[in-house]
């Protein structure tokens, strides 16, 4: 081949290699931000400043989003529609200070590693990572490697870890058998974690997810639990300042006819389908700075089920609905020294406001995952539409929801 022909060929080859490499690098999520409240959808309770799990002091969230390729599926090549979400309960500054936690499985057709030790010890160590079903193993190993490189040994001098890594299945849009999530993608999600406002929708581990047969993914919401609410009926009781409770979901569950938004059966009004049967899952994380012990956090995790049910889910046989709750209170409670220590605890009798906040924030987080999203075309040109904003607003208006479109309900005697 002549030099004249070689030069353009080499240039083209180099360009293709650069494009292929860049396509597999973490990419930013779309800049559009339209949340449920922006559409006038009413929710009970008062959200925090960011209406996100990051309203809980110390909590940080980071993403790696991987999108590349189009057309026919070629296993190992793509198309790629996946990613990683990392949640750091105490942030990077206190990575080696475990938090009290509680775990609950509503339906166990899924995986969340490390929960046997959470159940046994009551502690959650290090970041929580969310990804796709077939990347759990590499994500778990990557978390351990990252902690070894950036953390320190425990109080006994051992460097060991049982990370919490959870999954939902993105194989309708993503080359899930191609193992595109690499250790560096997990590291990027951890290292990019931050407080403040966070992205939602098709981002991080939620990139290729489908919820109620609309484009799903990552959603979040928060609630402020006022001091008066946790002080009980005795107004003279001393109580701390307000507590924060936040929820983050990776939403990949439900059939379209089930979708319910503030009592309105939205899914039945917008026909369409993706699956022949439910194949999805949902991971729900609940974080709070209220001083709760592991058994109380397990109770909190259970209440996420009620928020999920508000959106219409019945937690089908094929759905992996796994929930974990943690508290950032009681720092250093896991330290070996001193041998006896004091911790703070909220009485069980005062937990109802936290239960309410969990249900409310879970419901809103799931709807946010649907609203702050966009259509996506994935493997084999599978197309999943986002929930149409204008149609949703039209439905809410048509059914004349009182108090910004809240549904009217029958009482126990069947009267309106």
Language-model features: where?
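N-terminal secretory signal peptides that target proteins for export/translocation
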Residues: 1-6
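Bacterial N-terminal signal peptides
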Residues: 8-20
């Amino acid at each position: 081949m002549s030099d004249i022909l070689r030069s353009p060929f080499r240039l083209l080859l180099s360009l293709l290699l650069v494009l292929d490499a860049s396509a597999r690098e973490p990419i930013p999520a779309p800049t559009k931000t339209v949340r449920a409240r922006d559409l006038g959808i009413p929710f009970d309770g008062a959200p925090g400043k960011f209406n996100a799990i990051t309203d809980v002091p110390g909590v940080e969230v980071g993403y790696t989003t991987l999108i590349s390729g189009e057309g026919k599926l070629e296993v190992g090549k793509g198309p790629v529609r996946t990613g990683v979400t990392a949640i750091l309960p105490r942030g990077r500054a206190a990575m080696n200070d475990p938090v009290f936690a509680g775990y609950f499985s509503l339906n166990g057709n899924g995986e969340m590693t490390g929960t046997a030790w959470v159940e046994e010890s009551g502690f959650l160590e290090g970041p929580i990572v969310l990804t796709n079903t077939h990347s759990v193993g590499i994500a778990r190993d990557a978390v351990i490697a990252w902690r070894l490189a950036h953390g320190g040994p425990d109080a006994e001098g051992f460097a060991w870890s049982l990370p919490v890594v959870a999954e939902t299945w993105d194989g309708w849009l993503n080359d899930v058998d191609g193992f595109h999530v690499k250790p560096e993608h997990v590291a990027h999600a951890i290292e990019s974690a931050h407080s403040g406002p966070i992205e939602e929708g098709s981002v991080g581990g939620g990139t290729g997810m489908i919820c109620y047969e609309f484009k799903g993914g990552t959603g979040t919401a928060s609630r402020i639990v006022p001091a008066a609410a946790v002080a009980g009926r005795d107004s003279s009781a001393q109580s701390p300042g307000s507590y924060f409770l936040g929820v983050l979901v990776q939403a990949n569950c439900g059939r379209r006819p089930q979708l319910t938004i503030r009592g309105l059966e939205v899914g039945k009004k917008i026909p369409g389908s993706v699956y022949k049967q439910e194949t999805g899952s949902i991971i729900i994380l609940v974080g709070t700075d209220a001083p709760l012990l592991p058994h109380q956090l397990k109770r909190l995790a259970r209440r996420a089920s009620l928020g999920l049910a508000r959106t219409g889910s019945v937690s089908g046989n094929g759905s992996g609905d796994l929930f974990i709750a943690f508290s950032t209170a009681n720092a250093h409670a896991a330290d070996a020294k001193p041998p006896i220590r004091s911790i703070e605890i909220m009485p069980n009798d005062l937990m109802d406001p936290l239960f309410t906040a969990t249900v409310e924030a879970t419901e809103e987080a799931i709807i946010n995952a649907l609203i702050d999203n966009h259509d996506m075309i994935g493997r084999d040109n599978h197309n999943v539409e986002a929930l149409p904003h204008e149609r949703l607003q039209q439905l809410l208006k048509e059914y004349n929801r009182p108090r910004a479109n809240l549904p009217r309900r029958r009482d126990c005697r069947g009267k309106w």
